[in-house]
């Protein structure tokens, strides 16, 4: 089975410009490809997983990844898939985030012996002459055509700034620049980037008379059509300081029954034949084993074998005894926040990140989905005495430790 065939079999491919040429290049290790990452936070998150795994797969097949950090475009803001204008960032914040990204990516990508490179488009975009851009690049783009793309149509009613309107031109110029300087002949990205990617291939064709290719990756959506990688606390980060290895493991251990096989195919390096065999007989205990395999595989990939072993052992200990709290996610509550040594259950649930609002916490309590120190809490007005270590159980699988500082 070729690399390209496996990508299709796993369901990784959404759209592409030329299937035969793309397959030929990546199957023979002749693709120098790039994927862009927006440095809008100081850590990668689950939303980046698809791109990271694709880069790793293609590099293992002899292809060369270029990681493009959008230090320049982050100062504009990408309207693709957005309904509001994004806050612009300072150069200092962007550089800090770039440094954090490089460190995390090294777990996925081999940067030795020039096997992969990291570039920042701020290095060329911030030095461009405006008149030159208008003459050399702007002349290659049709405003009429740009306005037909969904990313702009969605924003027209609420207001699209000229600043954001330039994003497609800047991203297209990135591809053109990488093609010239590094022989980059292919771009990969999320399906919401399709219009921007086509702009790059067209610019290369018009300016250089050469062919370049684009392929979009399937978006990581759950069975309800919502993007995966969110919890009550927010994003699921790849930084252990933001999302602990145990929390990361638990996120994947608790995916819905309908999503586990899809996640194994899209995100792990478990052989596709093994996954397909599991899919044919997936029920009962085998379903739990599939979820454990998913959680362990991804935790090992992101945090290493030792952290994955610890997370798995902690999860099993908690589920079997309900008492092992050593590796539980923990929230420290300042003593000053307590009244007579206690706190209302609804406030406590929100502060611990177990619920997004008091209303959600109230419904959960009323439905019998909350226990504190092995005692079910059914009164939304209950005051919980916090003394030493307090263990909250949400539903059947989520455990959380609260300590007072």
Question: What is each stretch, according to the model?
Answer:
Residues 204-405:
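Conserved nucleotide- and phosphate/pyrophosphate-binding catalytic cores
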Residues 1-193, 201, 208-213, 226, ...:
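NTP-dependent nucleotidyl-transfer catalytic core
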């Amino acid at each position: 089975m070729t690399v390209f065939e496996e990508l299709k079999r796993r369901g990784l491919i959404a759209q592409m410009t030329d299937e035969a040429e793309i397959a030929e290049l990546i199957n023979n290790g002749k693709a120098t490809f790039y994927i862009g990452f927006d440095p809008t936070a100081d850590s990668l998150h689950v939303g980046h997983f698809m791109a990271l795994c694709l880069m790793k797969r293609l590099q293992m097949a002899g292809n060369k990844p270029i990681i493009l950090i959008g230090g320049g475009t982050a100062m504009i803001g990408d309207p693709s898939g957005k309904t509001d204008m994004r806050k612009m960032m300072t150069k200092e914040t962007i550089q800090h985030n770039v440094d954090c990204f490089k460190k995390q990516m090294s777990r996925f990508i081999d940067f030795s012996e020039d096997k992969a490179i990291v570039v920042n488009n701020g290095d060329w975009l911030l030095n461009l002459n405006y008149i030159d851009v208008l003459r050399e690049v702007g002349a290659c783009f049709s405003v009429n055509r740009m306005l037909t793309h969904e990313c702009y149509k969605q924003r027209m009613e609420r207001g699209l700034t000229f600043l954001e309107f330039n994003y497609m031109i800047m991203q297209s110029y990135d591809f053109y620049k990488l093609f010239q300087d590094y022989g980059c002949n292919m771009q990969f990205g999320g399906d919401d980037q399709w219009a921007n990617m086509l702009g790059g291939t067209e610019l290369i064709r018009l300016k250089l008379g050469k062919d370049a290719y684009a392929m979009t990756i399937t978006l990581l959506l759950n069975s309800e059509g919502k993007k995966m990688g969110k919890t009550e606390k927010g994003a699921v980060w790849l930084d252990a300081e933001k999302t602990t290895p145990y929390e990361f493991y638990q996120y994947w251990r608790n995916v819905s029954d309908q999503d586990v096989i899809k996640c194994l195919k899209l995100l792990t390096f478990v052989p596709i034949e093994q996954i397909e065999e599991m899919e044919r007989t997936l029920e009962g205990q085998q379903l739990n084993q599939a979820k454990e395999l998913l959680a362990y595989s991804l935790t090992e990939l992101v945090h290493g074998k030792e952290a994955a072993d610890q997370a798995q052992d902690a999860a099993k200990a908690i589920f079997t005894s309900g008492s092992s709290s050593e590796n539980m996610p923990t929230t420290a509550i300042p003593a000053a926040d307590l009244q007579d040594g206690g706190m209302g259950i609804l406030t406590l649930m929100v502060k611990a990140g177990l619920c997004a609002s008091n209303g959600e916490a109230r419904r959960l309590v009323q439905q019998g989905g909350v226990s504190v120190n092995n005692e079910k809490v059914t009164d939304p007005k209950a005051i919980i005495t916090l003394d030493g270590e307090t263990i909250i159980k949400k539903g059947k699988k989520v455990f959380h430790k609260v300590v007072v500082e």
